[in-house]
């Protein structure tokens, strides 16, 4: 099968077909180009997505620690590598497929143009030979007709008796001339015809088949090139499949690395404050002052003793406690015992069972009208708030447990830096010894400035370590003391109630007097206690805010930098001081945020 023999007369068709082949090649090249743009945009969008969800971290504290977060960031890293492989696909297609197609299309256009020009030239040469043969043929035909006319004229004159001999001779000469010219044109025509037949045979059996064969080979090479580009298009994708598979395997491994128990433990390590939960509230017996005995002589005495006891045990307690519900405490009474409800004593000391309706009625009223005294645990999150203000050097703005961890981390970092400086000092000393033994290697004095700087760094780091260790010891000792103090309070069931700090810690002061309401006669009206206000505590000093404090949490007092407040209760060791504004608003503020000045007659109270 050859175009030269099968399609010898289809020059125009082959012209159109080869042009279509080049157009198809360029169309496929355009397709590859658009695919490359898609891959590039896809990779760019993936990288932007990774950059959006994996921002740069400014410090180590912001690095992800939870296994779910670490797994997500590992997935983002794998996705970033996956985006890189999409870029590799685009680059491979651009180099191996698109670039090769464009170069080959340019070469095809040049080669096709050359072959078509050769075919047209061969056709033009054959047409020229045909015209020469046709002209000689027409000239031979014309000379033959002229010779026939000359012969007819000669015969007519020769048969005419009236014609002169000269006319006959002239006609004969004219006939001979025309006959000679006809013979010459005949020979010319025969030569041109033979030449044309030869050129035509050469054209259709040699020249055109050769040109068409070259066009056929060109078109077949175009088809082969398309096949190679198809394969290269797929190979560009197949080459990155192993790496993409590794990226996907990395994502699967990241998913398997998620440990929910470890994350839960990290939550505990991150937010554990170190405080202990508040202890149980002691039972407050408000019914003992209304107990009566059968003897009339003991009624008034019991009232007086009860009144004295209540007045003594309740004096000033309202000042020392931040009431969670904003109400004045009910009168304090000795603990209620089962025998006090049902027994009475006679003057001679004998006891007998009795049933009093009044205490039961009072207890029922307490159950129906009394509000639950539940401490607020929202304040326990005081030390976890990220809005506390600027971080302090000793981390006193953090809860004890978090403060201990931060200090321990800083001590570990300082120890590592100290070890580096110590190693550098040892290296400098060794180098100095080498220089002293071999002066030609260097000047020992040149190492003295660096050695002095290293020693200064070591001293500075040791001081920092000592300072942080002192803070750490303070935190550990304070946490242990607070637990012992709360345990002692729970065992002794002190009637005095501890002050609740904003963190939820309690500070019990057994030496503080407790003030109760005035002695009332008749039935006790529980609604009076609901709406009475506490007397304001006296100021024991004043303070000035060093840092601003928002005071969003319950029981705290917001303050601005430079604001002056009254001190109404000192820091009991939990890092909080109770203060009051001039408008009477009270609350707790961080002790490390204020500059405290106490009155001389109030210090130590």
From Swiss-Prot:
<dbReference type="Pfam" id="PF00018">
    <property type="entry name" value="SH3_1"/>
</dbReference>
<dbReference type="InterPro" id="IPR035494">
    <property type="entry name" value="FNBP1L_F-BAR"/>
</dbReference>
<dbReference type="GO" id="GO:0008289">
    <property type="term" value="F:lipid binding"/>
</dbReference>
<dbReference type="GO" id="GO:0005886">
    <property type="term" value="C:plasma membrane"/>
</dbReference>
<dbReference type="GO" id="GO:0006914">
    <property type="term" value="P:autophagy"/>
</dbReference>
<dbReference type="GO" id="GO:0072583">
    <property type="term" value="P:clathrin-dependent endocytosis"/>
</dbReference>
<feature type="region of interest" description="Interaction with DNM1">
    <location>
        <begin position="522"/>
        <end position="605"/>
    </location>
</feature>
<feature type="coiled-coil region">
    <location>
        <begin position="392"/>
        <end position="484"/>
    </location>
</feature>
<dbReference type="InterPro" id="IPR036028">
    <property type="entry name" value="SH3-like_dom_sf"/>
</dbReference>
<keyword id="KW-0597">Phosphoprotein</keyword>
<dbReference type="GO" id="GO:0005938">
    <property type="term" value="C:cell cortex"/>
</dbReference>
<dbReference type="GO" id="GO:0005856">
    <property type="term" value="C:cytoskeleton"/>
</dbReference>
<keyword id="KW-0472">Membrane</keyword>
<comment type="function">
    <text>Required to coordinate membrane tubulation with reorganization of the actin cytoskeleton during endocytosis. May bind to lipids such as phosphatidylinositol 4,5-bisphosphate and phosphatidylserine and promote membrane invagination and the formation of tubules. Also promotes CDC42-induced actin polymerization by activating the WASL/N-WASP-WASPIP/WIP complex, the predominant form of WASL/N-WASP in cells. Actin polymerization may promote the fission of membrane tubules to form endocytic vesicles. Essential for autophagy of intracellular bacterial pathogens.</text>
</comment>
<feature type="modified residue" description="Phosphoserine">
    <location>
        <position position="488"/>
    </location>
</feature>
<feature type="region of interest" description="Interaction with DNM2 and WASL">
    <location>
        <begin position="541"/>
        <end position="597"/>
    </location>
</feature>
<dbReference type="Pfam" id="PF00611">
    <property type="entry name" value="FCH"/>
</dbReference>
<feature type="domain" description="REM-1">
    <location>
        <begin position="397"/>
        <end position="474"/>
    </location>
</feature>
<keyword id="KW-0206">Cytoskeleton</keyword>
<dbReference type="GO" id="GO:0006900">
    <property type="term" value="P:vesicle budding from membrane"/>
</dbReference>
<keyword id="KW-0072">Autophagy</keyword>
<feature type="modified residue" description="Phosphoserine">
    <location>
        <position position="501"/>
    </location>
</feature>
<feature type="site" description="Mediates end-to-end attachment of dimers">
    <location>
        <position position="165"/>
    </location>
</feature>
<feature type="modified residue" description="Phosphoserine">
    <location>
        <position position="505"/>
    </location>
</feature>
<feature type="region of interest" description="Interaction with DAAM1, DIAPH1 and DIAPH2">
    <location>
        <begin position="541"/>
        <end position="605"/>
    </location>
</feature>
<keyword id="KW-0968">Cytoplasmic vesicle</keyword>
<dbReference type="GO" id="GO:0005737">
    <property type="term" value="C:cytoplasm"/>
</dbReference>
<feature type="coiled-coil region">
    <location>
        <begin position="66"/>
        <end position="258"/>
    </location>
</feature>
<dbReference type="GO" id="GO:0060271">
    <property type="term" value="P:cilium assembly"/>
</dbReference>
<dbReference type="GO" id="GO:0045296">
    <property type="term" value="F:cadherin binding"/>
</dbReference>
<dbReference type="InterPro" id="IPR035493">
    <property type="entry name" value="FNBP1L_SH3"/>
</dbReference>
<dbReference type="GO" id="GO:0016050">
    <property type="term" value="P:vesicle organization"/>
</dbReference>
<feature type="compositionally biased region" description="Basic and acidic residues">
    <location>
        <begin position="476"/>
        <end position="490"/>
    </location>
</feature>
<feature type="region of interest" description="Disordered">
    <location>
        <begin position="476"/>
        <end position="539"/>
    </location>
</feature>
<dbReference type="InterPro" id="IPR001452">
    <property type="entry name" value="SH3_domain"/>
</dbReference>
<dbReference type="GO" id="GO:0051491">
    <property type="term" value="P:positive regulation of filopodium assembly"/>
</dbReference>
<feature type="compositionally biased region" description="Acidic residues">
    <location>
        <begin position="527"/>
        <end position="536"/>
    </location>
</feature>
<keyword id="KW-1003">Cell membrane</keyword>
<dbReference type="InterPro" id="IPR001060">
    <property type="entry name" value="FCH_dom"/>
</dbReference>
<keyword id="KW-0446">Lipid-binding</keyword>
<dbReference type="GO" id="GO:0010324">
    <property type="term" value="P:membrane invagination"/>
</dbReference>
<keyword id="KW-0728">SH3 domain</keyword>
């Amino acid at each position: 099968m050859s175009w030269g023999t099968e399609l010898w007369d289809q020059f125009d068709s082959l012209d159109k077909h080869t042009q279509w082949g080049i157009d198809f090649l360029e169309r496929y090249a355009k397709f590859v180009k658009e695919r490359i743009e898609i891959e590039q945009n896809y990779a760019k969008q993936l990288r932007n997505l990774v950059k959006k969800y994996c921002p740069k971290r400014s410090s180590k504290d912001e690095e992800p620690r939870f296994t779910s977060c670490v797994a997500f960031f590992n997935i983002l890293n794998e996705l970033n590598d996956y985006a890189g492989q999409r870029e590799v696909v685009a680059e491979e297609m651009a180099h191996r497929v698109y670039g090769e197609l464009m170069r080959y299309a340019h070469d095809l256009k040049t080669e096709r143009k050359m072959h078509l020009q050769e075919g047209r030239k061969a056709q033009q040469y054959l047409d020229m030979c045909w015209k020469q043969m046709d002209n000689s043929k027409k000239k031979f035909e014309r000379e033959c007709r002229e010779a026939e006319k000359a012969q007819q004229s000669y015969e007519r004159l020769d048969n005419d008796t009236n014609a002169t001999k000269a006319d006959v001779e002239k006609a004969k000469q004219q006939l001979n001339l025309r006959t000679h010219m006809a013979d010459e044109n005949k020979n010319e025509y025969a030569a041109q015809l033979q030449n044309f037949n030869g050129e035509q045979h050469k054209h259709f059996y040699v020249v055109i088949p050769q040109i068409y064969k070259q066009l056929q080979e060109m078109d077949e090479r175009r088809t082969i090139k398309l096949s190679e580009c198809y394969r290269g298009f797929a190979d560009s994708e197949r080459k990155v499949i192993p790496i993409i598979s590794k990226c996907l395997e990395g994502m699967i491994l990241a998913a398997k690395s998620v440990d929910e128990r470890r994350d839960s433990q990290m939550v505990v390590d991150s937010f554990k404050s170190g405080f202990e939960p508040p202890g149980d509230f002691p039972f407050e017996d408000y019914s003992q002052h209304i107990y009566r005995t059968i003897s009339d002589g003991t009624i008034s005495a019991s009232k007086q003793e009860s009144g004295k006891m209540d007045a003594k045990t309740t004096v000033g307690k309202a000042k020392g406690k931040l009431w969670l519900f904003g109400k004045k405490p009910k009168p304090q009474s000795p603990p209620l015992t089962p025998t006090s409800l049902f027994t009475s004593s006679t003057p001679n000391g004998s006891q007998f069972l009795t049933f009093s309706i009044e205490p039961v009625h009072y207890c029922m009223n307490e159950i129906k009208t009394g509000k639950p005294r539940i401490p607020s645990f929202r304040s326990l999150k005081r030390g976890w708030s990220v809005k506390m203000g600027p971080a302090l050097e000793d981390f006193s703005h953090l809860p004890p447990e978090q403060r201990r961890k931060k200090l321990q981390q800083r001590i570990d970092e300082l120890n590592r830096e100290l070890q580096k400086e110590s190693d550098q000092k040892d290296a400098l000393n060794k180098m100095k010894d080498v220089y002293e033994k071999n002066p030609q290697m260097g000047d020992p004095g040149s190492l003295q400035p660096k050695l002095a700087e290293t020693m200064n760094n070591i001293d500075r780091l040791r001081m920092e370590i000592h300072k942080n260790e002192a803070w750490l010891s303070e935190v550990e000792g304070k946490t242990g003391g607070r637990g012992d103090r709360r345990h002692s309070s729970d065992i002794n069931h002190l009637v005095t109630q501890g002050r609740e700090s904003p963190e939820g810690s309690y500070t019990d002061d057994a030496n503080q007097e407790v003030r109760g309401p005035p002695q009332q006669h008749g039935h006790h009206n529980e609604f009076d206690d609901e709406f009475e206000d506490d007397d304001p505590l006296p100021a024991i000093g004043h303070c000035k805010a060093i840092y601003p404090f928002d005071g969003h949490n319950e029981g705290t007092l917001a303050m601005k930098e430079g604001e002056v407040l009254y001190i109404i209760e000192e820091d009991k060791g939990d890092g909080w001081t109770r203060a009051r504004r001039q408008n009477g608003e009270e609350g707790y503020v961080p002790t490390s945020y204020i500059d405290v000045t106490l009155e001389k007659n109030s210090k130590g109270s």
